Structures are given as C-alpha cells and as structure tokens.
C-alpha cells in the first residue's frame, strides 16, 4: 500500500563508492510504501555511486551526518559497496549515528558490506546477521554470529548478502518498518488506556 509507511522518516547512510543498486532499490521500495527517505553522508553536495567497478550516478546528499541523530529518524538503511562503508567506519559521527539506532532499538537494515558499520559501532554482540561472505570473520570477532542466508532478521536488525538478494531484502524491509509502526501504535494505545499515574486495577491500589 502506498501509505503503508506514511509519515515515517528513513535515513540512508552512504558516501562515495556506494553500490548504486543497493542504494536505489530499497530507496524506491520505501518511497513507494509512503516513507520519507533522506540521504545522510559524511559530506555535503553529492556522492559518487558505483555499478560494481564502473562509476554510476552522482547522488545529492540531503544532510551531513554530523548534524543529525538517530532520534531524527524512524529507521536506518546501510547500503554496501566496498569503499562506502570502509570510509564511513573511520568517521566518528557516522559510527555514532549507527550505534544510536541500535541502542534505541530502531529498525536497521544493512546489505553486502554495509554491516562493516555495525562491526565498527560494536553493535553485533549476541546478534546473528548475514553479509558479503568476506565479512564473516569480522562479524564473529565483533561478537556476532554469521549465517549464509538471503535475508536474516534478528529482532529489528535486517541483513542481506549481495545485490541478488535485493528483491527479498526490500520486501522484508517494508515489512519490518510496518511491524515497528504497529508495535508503537500498540504501545501508545496501552499507555493511553493505562496511564502510569493511574492506580492499578483491582481492589487495592499500591502506593
């Protein structure tokens, strides 16, 4: 449904060297579902996307990562491309941005080499993910478990291995965000029905 994610704001964190299709495919899927998508980067202007080893399009950056926090968004997407996350993992603001999403238990989706940022943010302890196969040792050294699957979901963390996985990745990404919205709505309904200041139901209200 076009309005499935209406009002949700999703950050895409990327820089030069991002694999173009890993940026555009989930970007378009989320837009079609009604989400607002924002390209966050380590610099202003434009970034250079890649089609494997060839230059792709130049993509406009919406906001610098140093000027925003995870609280400004509902979810985060980490596309791959080797140079992209390898550069971002050396940027303290980018790493902090990723860590904040994980600490706030917000949906995070990463594909291919994107999970390198999760490794750098020390956000994989006790988590099970997939990625480009060469990241397996990095994931395990960071305290995570690695599996070879098209799509892996661990709570609100979604990961996939490569561009060929994008169709399944995009479907699951929209589902993950929709489920998170439903969960928040339920929490809000409970809070409205049973405010924290209300006495407990039953014959005795504890003080």
Q: Where do the model's predicted regions map?
A:
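Extended, subdomain-level signal for the structured scaffold at the beginning of enzyme domains
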Residues: 1-104, 108, 116-128, 136-181
């Amino acid at each position: 449904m076009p309005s499935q994610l209406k009002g949700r704001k999703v950050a895409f964190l990327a820089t030069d060297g991002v694999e173009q299709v890993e940026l555009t495919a989930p970007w378009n899927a989320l837009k079609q579902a009604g989400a607002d998508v924002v390209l966050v980067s380590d610099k202003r202007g434009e970034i250079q996307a890649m089609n494997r080893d060839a230059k792709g399009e130049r993509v406009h950056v919406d906001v610098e990562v140093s000027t925003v926090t995870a609280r400004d968004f509902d979810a985060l997407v980490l596309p791959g491309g080797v140079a992209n996350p390898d550069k971002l993992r050396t940027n303290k603001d980018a790493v902090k941005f990723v860590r904040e999403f994980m600490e706030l238990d917000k949906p995070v989706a990463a594909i291919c080499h994107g999970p390198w940022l999760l490794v750098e943010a020390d956000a994989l302890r006790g988590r099970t993910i997939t990625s480009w196969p060469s990241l397996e040792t990095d994931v395990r050294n960071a305290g995570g478990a690695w599996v070879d699957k098209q799509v892996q979901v661990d709570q609100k963390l979604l990961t996939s291995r490569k561009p060929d996985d994008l169709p399944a990745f995009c479907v699951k990404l929209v589902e993950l965000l929709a489920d998170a919205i439903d969960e928040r709505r339920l929490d809000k309904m409970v809070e409205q029905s049973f405010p924290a200041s209300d006495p407990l139901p039953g014959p005795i209200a504890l003080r």
